[in-house]
Regions:
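C-terminal regulatory/oligomerization modules of transcriptional regulators
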Residues: 1-21, 143-166
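Charged, amphipathic alpha-helical coiled-coil/dimerization segments
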Residues: 14, 91-149
Length: 166
């Protein structure tokens, strides 16, 4: 796996090794910081509804992505371990936030559907997520945000091509 130091060399960035190491460390820490900050912002809501973070993440994933409705979808798309998905789905069912529904034509496939009981936490969770994103992009002008998303889209397209070619 390429690390940021090699990426800076490949991209012909004119920086020192010390600067590359600094970028590498911040690149590694970046995802961790986002996760820590998001979890920290979620704590009051989790406490209010007495839910663990993983159960909340699963509920919000189902609410925000109606095209994904199964435990397998959660495992594959959200990369949450199957045993954690199973335990937390059971909890969400017991708490009345979701129901299980067999898929017509395929008894082996079970859909997970948010219930009206989940509406309040979903509404508050979506507001929390929207506010969190707003805070992430504070002090960034529109041009910087646009460049960021254009760059991310291009990287995603390049990754798709690499995966397709190999």
């Amino acid at each position: 796996m390429l690390i940021l130091r090699e990426l800076t060399i490949l991209c012909n960035l004119n920086i020192t090794m010390k600067e590359a190491d600094s970028l590498m460390n911040s690149g590694i820490e970046f995802a961790q910081k986002i996760n820590l900050a998001y979890n920290s912002v979620c704590k009051p809501l989790l406490h209010k509804f007495n839910l663990p973070q993983t159960a909340f993440d699963i509920l919000m994933f189902l609410a925000n992505n109606p095209e994904y409705t199964t435990a397998r979808d959660i495992v594959e798309v959200r990369k949450i371990k199957a045993n954690l998905v199973s335990v937390n789905v059971d909890r969400l069912v017991c708490d009345g936030y979701i129901i299980r529904k067999e898929t017509k034509g395929d008894r082996r496939k079970t859909q997970l559907i948010c219930t009206p009981v989940a509406e309040e936490i979903i509404k508050e969770g979506q507001a929390l997520q929207k506010d969190f994103l707003k805070q992430l992009f504070d002090n960034m002008d529109t041009a910087t945000k646009k460049a960021f998303f254009i760059g991310m889209k291009q990287i995603e397209d390049n990754l798709d091509k690499i995966l397709e070619d190999n």
